[in-house]
Amino acid sequence: MFTPKTDRVKKLSELFPKAIEELGVIFEQPARIYIDWQNVLHWQEKLGWHFDLKRLKQLFDSFDTIQSVTIYTGTLEGDQRSGEQIKEIENCGYILSTKPVKLMKISIDVSSIPDDSPAILKSFMKTKFLSKLDIDTVKILNKKLFLLNKQGVTYIEELKCNFDVEMGVDMLLDCERNNTDSFILWSGDSDFASPVMQIKNAGKKAVLFAVSGKVAPELDETGVFIFDIKKIKEFVCFPKEIPQSIKDKIDPIKSQRDSLRSP
């Protein structure tokens, strides 16, 4: 059942009843939510707005069938921003699954390959994109890398922290132990195609929260229901990112006061 956790959630639910109705169907049975936070961060870049951890939890807490919400994210040791985010996740009441972020060194040393070889480029460029490049472009890029090599730069560093295995295992264990009826996955990665199919074959409900059009084909082919997260933007984005027209409706007095203060 939907019971607004805050007054703002209540007012927004009155403005966006269809979104709440759709969520009500998704959460009509006991549900557990599994969030791949790295995926969410990538979505933010595409969407142009951000997920507010506190507001997101308030929305989830408005549905009494949600049993747990687990966020999977890496911890970058010694990084203040990473530490603050970990604390925020815990303070908001999420279940946290974390592990240290690994710093991977990727070679960009082209000294041992022909100038028209994409061998080094393959290590940090997507294959589909690389296949679109002609030989001349590959040569130009390799020349740029060669110049970096002459300056002493022979590798780049990339942060790695993948939780696909942990998330998949947790979902399947919950399914095997009959811990819940509905599995709500926040990710669009192809690695989840197999766990989703196993959950569906077990007679359980699986729902994918993702950005429409940004779901891996393998996952899409499972037939899993996809909920477009853009439908809940106003419920979960930073308050400053709520459109002014919506702010005027949920708090007209404050909006009027703010407009009078504006130069």
Model-inferred region functions:
Residues M1-D7, D258-P263:
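Polar low-complexity intrinsically disordered regions
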Residues T98-P263:
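Nuclease catalytic cores that cleave nucleic-acid phosphodiester bonds
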